């Protein structure tokens, strides 16, 4: 089994956990938790949320 990464926050998802979310256009998103799912449905941007690893990656890369 292969590990997936959450398309919202960027965390790795252990096999057998998480959700597969299929959009209307047929693209597939892997979601690690209900927290990520709710924020995605509210159309929030992960780069602006402090609890996501993507926020910290962008924050530190902009300082260089």
From Swiss-Prot:
Q: Does the keyword RNA-binding apply?
A: yes
Protein name, please?
Large ribosomal subunit protein eL24
Pfam families the record matches: Ribosomal_L24e
- The residues listed in the UniProt record as binding Zn(2+), with positions renumbered to this chain, are 6, 9, 32, 36
The answer to whether the entry has keyword Ribonucleoprotein is: yes
Q: Which cofactor does it need?
A: Zn(2+)
Keyword annotations for this protein? Metal-binding, Ribonucleoprotein, Ribosomal protein, RNA-binding, rRNA-binding, Zinc, Zinc-finger
What is the primary gene name for this protein? Answer: rpl24e
GO molecular function per UniProt: rRNA binding; structural constituent of ribosome; zinc ion binding
Assembly behavior: Part of the 50S ribosomal subunit. Forms a cluster with proteins L3 and L14.
Record-linked CDD domains:
Ribosomal_L24e_L24
Which NCBIfam families does the entry mention? PRK14891.1-1 (NF034186)
GO BP of this protein:
translation
Q: Which Gene3D superfamilies match?
A: Ribosomal protein L24e
Please report the organism this UniProt entry assigns to the protein: Methanococcus aeolicus (strain ATCC BAA-1280 / DSM 17508 / OCM 812 / Nankai-3)
* Source organism, top-level taxon: Archaea
Provide one Gene Ontology cellular component.
ribosome
Q: Which residues cross the membrane?
A: none
């Amino acid at each position: 089994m292969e590990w997936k990464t959450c398309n919202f926050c960027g965390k790795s998802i252990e096999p057998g956990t998480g959700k597969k979310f299929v959009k209307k256009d047929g693209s597939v998103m892997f979601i690690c938790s209900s927290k990520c799912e709710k924020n995605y449905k509210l159309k929030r941007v992960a780069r602006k949320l402090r609890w996501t690893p993507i926020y910290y990656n962008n924050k530190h890369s902009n300082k260089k």
